[in-house]
């Protein structure tokens, strides 16, 4: 069988038309593939949000006094019984958050007089300057607060964005990832309902996690590595290093947060070099934000690192050491005391480890 392309003169109208049609098909294929990938990620985000939030549906909302970036206090418990509450967790580096922001502001404009809308920045590898610039860029008018991790713990944050609707009765009625019909229906129901509020004694908060600063001795903290090994922090006869990170840091933040991405790469390489040069026990502690056990295992299988990994699914270890930025390295001495906490901008990990010996 002859090849129809070979039979067309290279400069003929028929050949040029064929090339244009073929190029259009390639572009269409790329667009459809990208759209399918985006849809798959959206669906996975929704699944994770709903799975993590399933146990909270129908439960009383958290008791918390939120402080906006302007210093205004919002007492959630005082709103229960008077007005529904819509909390949206987000981050400036989050791509789907950016995509949803126009719709989020539109909801504030159309429902803000009937629903207390609050933009809850996760406070995870973010800063006030970036948040203020983001607010200006997207012309956001709802109150914005920065979480210290406690509200995320109360509401089982697993993805960004994550939507939480609390009805007029003070009970959680919707948790999801998508700005979809289910979210809008939940908001409409919350506005129209006339049920009695849950009592303040019923409202719930996650158990407080003890926090340790430099000089403190770590107690009552145990972790389990991906391979099932139990480690009791604060006990042992040798120093330990806890490397707080997320497996998506290097790749996902490469464009939106290049400094953070490079810091994660630098720390990973430094740790790999140091692991063979010291008698310290090294542990990589991954955040549970957008990370499951299988995600972390995939990272271990595809990344050249020998670092034993731990999934901090509910970010309890992150809260225990007040970690809000990745990468952060916590050094414990042989007596279980916090000797040093190195932030992302600290590039003296090698010297800090030598000083601990």
Model features per residue range: what roles?
Residues 1-18:
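N-terminal secretory signal peptides that target proteins for export/translocation
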Residues 22-31:
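Bacterial N-terminal signal peptides
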Residues 41-77, 181-185, 189-233:
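N-terminal "domain-start" segment that seeds a small globular fold
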Residues 89-106, 244-269:
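Conserved redox-active cysteine motifs that mediate thiol-disulfide chemistry
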């Amino acid at each position: 069988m002859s090849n129809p392309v070979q039979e067309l003169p290279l400069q003929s109208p028929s050949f040029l038309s064929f090339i244009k049609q073929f190029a259009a098909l390639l572009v269409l294929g790329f667009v459809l593939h990208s759209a399918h990938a985006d849809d798959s990620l959206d669906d996975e985000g929704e699944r994770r949000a709903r799975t993590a939030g399933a146990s909270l549906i129908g439960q009383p909302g958290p008791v918390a006094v939120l402080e906006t970036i302007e210093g205004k206090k919002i007492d959630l418990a005082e709103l229960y019984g008077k007005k529904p509450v819509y909390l949206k967790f987000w981050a400036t580096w989050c791509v789907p958050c950016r995509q949803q922001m126009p719709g989020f502001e539109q909801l504030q404009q159309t429902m803000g007089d009937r629903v207390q809308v609050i933009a809850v920045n996760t406070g995870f590898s973010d800063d006030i300057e970036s948040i203020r610039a983001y607010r200006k860029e997207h012309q956001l008018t709802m109150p914005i607060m920065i979480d210290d991790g406690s509200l995320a713990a109360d509401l089982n944050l697993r993805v960004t964005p994550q939507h939480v609707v609390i009805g007029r009765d003070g009970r959680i009625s919707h948790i999801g990832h998508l700005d979809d019909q289910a979210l809008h229906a939940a908001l409409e129901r919350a506005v129209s309902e006339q049920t009695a509020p849950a009592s303040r004694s019923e409202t719930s908060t996650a158990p407080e996690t003890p926090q340790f600063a430099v000089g403190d001795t770590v107690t009552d903290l145990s972790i389990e590595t991906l391979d099932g090994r139990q480690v009791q922090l604060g006990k042992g006869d040798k120093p330990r290093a806890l490397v707080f990170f997320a497996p998506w840091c290097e790749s996902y933040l490469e464009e939106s947060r290049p400094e953070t991405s490079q810091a994660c790469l630098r720390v990973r390489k430094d740790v790999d070099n140091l692991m063979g040069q010291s008698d310290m026990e090294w542990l990589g502690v991954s955040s549970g934000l957008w990370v499951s056990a299988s995600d972390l295992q995939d990272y271990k299988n595809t990344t050249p690192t020998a670092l034993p990994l731990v999934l901090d699914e509910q970010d309890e270890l992150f809260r225990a050491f007040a970690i809000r930025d990745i990468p952060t390295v916590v050094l414990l001495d042989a007596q279980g005391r916090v000797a040093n906490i190195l932030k992302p901008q600290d590039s003296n990990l090698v010297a800090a480890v030598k000083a601990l010996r």
